[in-house]
Design a protein with these regions (language model features):
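Catalytic core of non-heme Fe(II) oxygenases with the double-stranded beta-helix
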Residues: 164-167, 171, 175-256
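Non-heme Fe(II)/2-oxoglutarate
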Residues: 98-189
Length: 256
């Protein structure tokens, strides 16, 4: 990306991509600079504004963070990143701002037993095995994952019968979700995208595996399908369950 910037210094997308790479390397200060350069070249670069907001929060730059959050709220920016950080900053700093995405996100958590509605073994279990045996599928490094691995890229970009079966089920359940909440006044529902694409991957964890708290920054709606869960003793019935929350454990109120 740096070479691209040298060749074309007015390339906002190159600065944005560089910022993303720097964030993956936990070089947040440099990432902030790159995002600001991208925005300077392209002021309406929404995704860069969103990533800058995340970066400022991680850097604990309270005043610049709220300046950026206020800017996005004034622009009526409705997305999961802004919604999440509105909640997290309220927990951390005790400052409440209008949440244009979802004021009560935990009210919109849905749990579905897919095995009672579909041929789960064929659609998910067998498909997952076939996908993992596909030579086009590789694994990627995932810093949020302990004692496990994650496939790289978007599985749904691989066109075959297995991914198509899974997509059909997911799209059907997404539509049922939307219809279920169709009367909601939340931005999550009222601003529902007219078109969308699916982005998915497989995660495999061994005993003792763990996935740290995170948000899917590019997603409007996120979900997890548990395909193969080993039997659990009654004393550890909650082990491996998906946990949803309004923020991370470290989003405690800042008393300074």
């Amino acid at each position: 990306y740096r070479q691209s910037i040298v060749l074309k210094p007015d390339h906002a997308e190159a600065y944005f991509s560089l910022g993303n790479t720097l964030r993956e390397l936990v070089r947040e200060e440099e990432a902030e600079t790159s995002y600001r350069q991208a925005i300077a070249l392209k002021p309406d670069y929404t995704v860069a504004h969103n990533h800058l907001l995340s970066c400022l929060y991680l850097l604990d730059k309270r005043s610049p963070f709220f300046d950026q959050l206020d800017y996005l709220i004034s622009k009526d920016e409705v997305n999961a990143v802004v919604g999440s950080l509105t909640w997290r900053s309220a927990l951390k700093y005790g400052v409440e701002k209008p949440n244009l995405f979802c004021k009560e996100p935990l009210e919109y958590v849905s749990h579905i037993d897919l095995s009672s509605k579909y041929n789960f073994e064929e659609i998910f279990v067998e498909s997952a095995k076939s996908i993992l045996n596909d030579e086009r599928v590789s694994n990627r490094q995932q810093s949020l994952l302990v004692n496990g691995y994650q496939t790289s890229g978007n599985l749904f970009s691989i066109e075959n019968d297995f991914t198509e079966k899974i997509q059909k089920v997911i799209r059907s359940e997404i539509e049922k979700y939307r219809v279920n909440f169709k009367d909601s006044e939340e931005g999550l529902i009222k601003k529902w995208p007219t078109d969308y694409s699916l982005y998915g991957w497989l995660i495999s964890m061994k005993s003792g595996g763990e996935l740290y708290p995170h948000i899917h920054e590019q997603g409007w709606l996120s979900g997890t399908i548990y395909i193969n869960v080993p039997p659990k003793p009654r004393s550890k019935a909650d082990n491996g369950n998906l946990v949803v929350s309004l923020g991370h454990d470290h989003d405690a109120t800042d008393t300074d």
